[in-house]
Structures are given as structure tokens and as C-alpha cells.
């Protein structure tokens, strides 16, 4: 894994003075402006913003798919400045799980094979790979769909396969970009329940959404507009009934001593 280290950190994400500019013809267009953002280990945060607000650009930088024009970014305690392409790939592979709106499943591979993919890149032996993939699918309630092809799965089931793939390598951070955007409300609710369970188990989750109802499932909401972040306490004063139910669920989970994901 080269310089990618597994060290204890208080924050899994640190962005300090981050700017991102793109060229449009001869003009430099600012997309992110002096972004300062910290996310603690074990936190569940939603970043909200309209189209063109810069939220996807920020997600790409945090996910080590892009680099800032200016500023410092640390992911899982690792400063990404100066990392080689291979080291950036290792950081994504071992420390970050990705969930996308469009699932990004391989159409000619089974659910199990799709989930095994990151483990193949990590050179995990075949038998161990299969065991880990089966366990991840069990966590999302799809142990009875392991041999199904994506075309045989509903939208919600496809997203659950994508979540299993994202967590199979036990990443420090789960990044979710509009994870319910292509789902009906029932499937979206199921995905949010899985995220809550994963967070209870210690997974740090950063979710991007334009939907305040979806954002309210997180413990913290940060809004972005015109490339500028501003903290928002909407999650605290938004859907009170939802938050009360979640607190009760968390208490029940603690009293039961934990358990499998939904």
C-alpha cells in the first residue's frame, strides 16, 4: 500500500482553505471557494446544495478523484498532496467506499461478482474474497440474491448491491452521491435504514443530496451554495418525529448489544 497508512485520527476528512477552479475558454471559473470542512470519525453528515453549487466537485476531491487548485485535504489522516496516481488509487481502494445514484454495476456479472470486485483489486484470495462478499450482501439483506444479474434486480436491490460493494473492504469512509436519487420512496427509505445501521457500526458517512428529507437522516447537515460551505442545523430542527424515532432505534440497538444491518 505504499505510503497509505492505517493510523488513528480524530477526523477522517479535513479540507482546509480548499479552492477549485476550472478553465472555460480563457476564463478561470471558481467552483469551490475557501472551503473549510472537518468530519470526525464515526460521523454521519449530509452536504446539501442545488445543481451547480459545487457539491459534486467537493465529493470528487474528498474521494480522491480530483485535486484542489489550492488548499489542503487529508483523507483518513493522509495528506493527498503529492501522492502518486497509484497511491491515490490505494487510498480509494482501502479507505473509501463509493455509492452512486446510477449504481455503476457490471451488467454481465452477478451480484456476488460485483461485490467481489474491490477485493480482486486488493489481491484478496478467492475463497476469502467470496466469504467477505457474502457477508457484505448479508448486511444489506441480499444473501438470497447472490447469483442474480443486475437485470434481474429492482432498483433498490441494485443500490443495495452497490452498498455491499462499497463496504466489502471495510473502508473508513462511505461517500454517497445522491444514493436515493433513482429510487422510489420505499427503496430510498430502506437505503437510509442501511446507512443508519452502518453508521451505528462505526462507518463514517458523507452523503450528497439535494433532498432535505433525505439529508435529515444524517446527524449533521452542511449546505453549499456557489462553492461556499455554510453549517446548517436543519437536521436538528427539521423532522423532529424522524429524529426522535432514530434516537429510540439507537437506544434499542445499544441495549441489544448491536446486530446485523437491515
Regions inferred by a protein language model and the residue ranges of each:
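C-terminal end-of-chain micro-motif
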Residues: 45, 259-262
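Feature targets compositionally biased, intrinsically disordered low-complexity regions
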Residues: 1, 16, 24, 70, ...
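Short, Lys/Arg-enriched N-terminal segments with co-localized hydrophobic residues
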Residues: 1-8
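ABC family nucleotide-binding domain
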Residues: 10-224
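Conserved beta-strand-loop-alpha-helix hinge in the C-terminal portion
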Residues: 228-255, 260
Amino acid at each position: 500500500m505504499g505510503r497509505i497508512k492505517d493510523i488513528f485520527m480524530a477526523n477522517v476528512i479535513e479540507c482546509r482553505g480548499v479552492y477549485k477552479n476550472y478553465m472555460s475558454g480563457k476564463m478561470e471559473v471558481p467552483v469551490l471557494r475557501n472551503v473549510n470542512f472537518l468530519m470526525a470519525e464515526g460521523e454521519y453528515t449530509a452536504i446539501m446544495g442545488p445543481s451547480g453549487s459545487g457539491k459534486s466537485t467537493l465529493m470528487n476531491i474528498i474521494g480522491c478523484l480530483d485535486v484542489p487548485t489550492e488548499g489542503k485535504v487529508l483523507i483518513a489522516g493522509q495528506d493527498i498532496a503529492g501522492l502518486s496516481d497509484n497511491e491515490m488509487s490505494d487510498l480509494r481502494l482501502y479507505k473509501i467506499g463509493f455509492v452512486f445514484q446510477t449504481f455503476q454495476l457490471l451488467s454481465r456479472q452477478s451480484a456476488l461478482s460485483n461485490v467481489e470486485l474491490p477485493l480482486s483489486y486488493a489481491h484478496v484470495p478467492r475463497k476469502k474474497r467470496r466469504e467477505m462478499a457474502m457477508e457484505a450482501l448479508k448486511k444489506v439483506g441480499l444473501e438470497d440474491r447472490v447469483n442474480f444479474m443486475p437485470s434481474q434486480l429492482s432498483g433498490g436491490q441494485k443500490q443495495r448491491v452497490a452498498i455491499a460493494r462499497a463496504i466489502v473492504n471495510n473502508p473508513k469512509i462511505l461517500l454517497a452521491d445522491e444514493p436515493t436519487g433513482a429510487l422510489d420512496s420505499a427503496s430510498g427509505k430502506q437505503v437510509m435504514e442501511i446507512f443508519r445501521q452502518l453508521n451505528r457500526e462505526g462507518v463514517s458517512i458523507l452523503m450528497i443530496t439535494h433532498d432535505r428529507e433525505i439529508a435529515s437522516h444524517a446527524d449533521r447537515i452542511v449546505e453549499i451554495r456557489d462553492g461556499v460551505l455554510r453549517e446548517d442545523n436543519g437536521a436538528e430542527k427539521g423532522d423532529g418525529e424522524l429524529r426522535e424515532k432514530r434516537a429510540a432505534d439507537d437506544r434499542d440497538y445499544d441495549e441489544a448489544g448491536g446486530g446485523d444491518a437491515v
